[in-house]
């Protein structure tokens, strides 16, 4: 370790700053600058996506049963809107759950940053 730096004008050593010699094999990089922080998992968004997925699947099943006649409450005039709403609710839930699954498994190109987070 080198001695502390002296002020050239007064010749008084500065005790606040300590210098040390770098090793000859050091290339100026430290390991911490290459480490990634662990990803922040958006639990609220994944819970919402799960809810959308389940509600959408339920509405698609009910709409299909209404359309096929197993549930006889109005027929096709009620089945088509239920199917459309079920599909519109199911698709975003499925999409975000797929991203969350692939991000959790570490697939290339998928990360939790692709899922919108609701932590305001």
From Swiss-Prot:
Record's subcellular location: Membrane; Golgi apparatus, trans-Golgi network; Cytoplasmic vesicle, Secretory vesicle, Synaptic vesicle; Early endosome
Membrane topology: Multi-pass membrane protein
A GO term from the CC aspect: early endosome
Highest taxon above the source species: Eukaryota
The keyword Phosphoprotein is assigned to this record: yes
GO biological process: synaptic vesicle transport
Modified residues (Phosphoserine): 15, 23-24
Keywords for this protein: Cytoplasmic vesicle, Endosome, Golgi apparatus, Membrane, Phosphoprotein, Synapse, Transmembrane, Transmembrane helix
Stretches that traverse the bilayer: 46-66, 79-99
Pfam families: TMEM_230_134
Predominant location category: membrane
Functional note: Involved in trafficking and recycling of synaptic vesicles.
Record family assignment: Belongs to the TMEM134/TMEM230 family.
Protein name: Transmembrane protein 230
Gene designation: TMEM230
């Amino acid at each position: 370790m080198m001695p502390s730096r002296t002020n050239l004008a007064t010749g008084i050593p500065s005790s606040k700053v300590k210098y040390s010699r770098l090793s000859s094999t050091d290339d100026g990089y430290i390991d911490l600058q290459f480490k990634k922080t662990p990803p922040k998992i958006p639990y609220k968004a994944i819970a919402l996506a799960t809810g959308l997925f389940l509600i959408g699947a339920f509405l698609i099943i009910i709409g299909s049963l209404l359309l096929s006649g197993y549930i006889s409450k109005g027929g096709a005039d009620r089945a088509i809107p239920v199917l459309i709403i079920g599909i519109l609710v199911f698709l975003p839930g499925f999409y975000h759950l797929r991203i969350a699954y692939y991000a959790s498994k570490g697939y290339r190109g998928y990360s939790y940053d692709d899922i919108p987070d609701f932590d305001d």
